[in-house]
Amino acid sequence: MRIMLLGSPGSGKGTQAKYLTERFGIPQISTGDMLRAAVREGTPLGMEAKKIMDAGQLVSDSIILGLIKERIAAPDCANGFLLDGFPRTIVQADALAELGVTLDHVVEIAVDDEEIVRRLSGRRVHPASGRTYHVVFNPPKVEGRDDETGEPLVQREDDKEETIRRRLEIYHVQTKPLVDYYRSKAAQGGVKFHTVPGVGSVEAIRDAVLASLA
C-alpha cells in the first residue's frame, strides 16, 4: 500500500504515520531522513546534496526525486511505503507522477487553523530536561514551573502564535492546493482520496484513517 498523508503542521500526521507504518509493515519515507542517510553514506546524490546544503542553499527537487526513486526501489518498499514531507507543491507532485511513482491512497487529516494554534501555542518546555507540558492538555502542577525542579518553563520560538500562523500561511499557499490536486486525480480514478477530521482522541482519528483505507 502506497500512502501519502496531507495535513497542516500540528495536525497529528506524524503520530498517524507512525501507526500506519507499524500496522501495514511499510517504511516511512521522509525526505529529511533520506538526505541525511545519502550524505552519511556518501552516495553520488548525497555528495551533491551535501555541497548544496554546505553552501546554505535548498536542495533541488531533482535531487529529492532521485533519492525517492532510489529509496522506493529498496526491498523493504516491495509492499508499499508512506511518503512524509514530499510532495509539498503541485510542481513536485507532477514531477513525482512523471517519475512513475504512483500512490494508492492520499489521506488529508483536516484540522482548522484556530485548533492548530491552540494545540501548538500551548506547549511549554523545561529546557534542561526536555520535559514538555501543555497549558490546556498537560499543565504543570504550578503554572509556568517544571514539576520536578520548580524551574521556569519556556515557550519555544516555533510554538509562538505568530510563528505558527506564518507556518500555516505557507502551508495554505504551497501545500493545501495538493488537496484539490489529488481530489481531482481521484475523480479520474488515479488514486483514492480521503479527508479525515483530525479532532478527537488519537485512537479515534487512527480508526477513521484505517476505515478510509479499507
UniProtKB/Swiss-Prot annotation:
The keyword Kinase applies. Keywords: ATP-binding, Cytoplasm, Kinase, Nucleotide biosynthesis, Nucleotide-binding, Transferase. The keyword Ribosomal protein does not apply. Consists of three domains, a large central CORE domain and two small peripheral domains, NMPbind and LID, which undergo movements during catalysis. The LID domain closes over the site of phosphoryl transfer upon ATP binding. Assembling and dissambling the active center during each catalytic cycle provides an effective means to prevent ATP hydrolysis. One of its GO terms (molecular function) is ATP binding. One of its GO terms (cellular component) is cytoplasm. Its EC number is 2.7.4.3. Its main location: cytoplasm. The lineage of its organism: Bacteria, Pseudomonadati, Pseudomonadota, Gammaproteobacteria, Methylococcales. GO terms for biological process: AMP salvage. Belongs to the adenylate kinase family. Coiled coil: none annotated. ATP binds at residues 10-15, 123, 132-133, 200. InterPro entries: Adenyl_kin_sub (IPR006259), Adenylat/UMP-CMP_kin (IPR000850), Adenylat_kinase_CS (IPR033690), Adenylate_kinase_lid-dom (IPR007862), P-loop_NTPase (IPR027417). SUPFAM superfamilies: P-loop containing nucleoside triphosphate hydrolases (SSF52540). It is an enzyme of class 2 (transferase). Catalyzes the reversible transfer of the terminal phosphate group between ATP and AMP. Plays an important role in cellular energy homeostasis and in adenine nucleotide metabolism. It is found in: Cytoplasm. Residues 122-159 are annotated as: LID. Monomer. It catalyses: AMP + ATP = 2 ADP. Pfam families: ADK (PF00406), ADK_lid (PF05191). Pathway: Purine metabolism; AMP biosynthesis via salvage pathway; AMP from ADP: step 1/1. This is Adenylate kinase. Residues 30-59 are annotated as: NMP. AMP binds at residues 31, 36, 57-59, 85-88, 92, 156, 167.
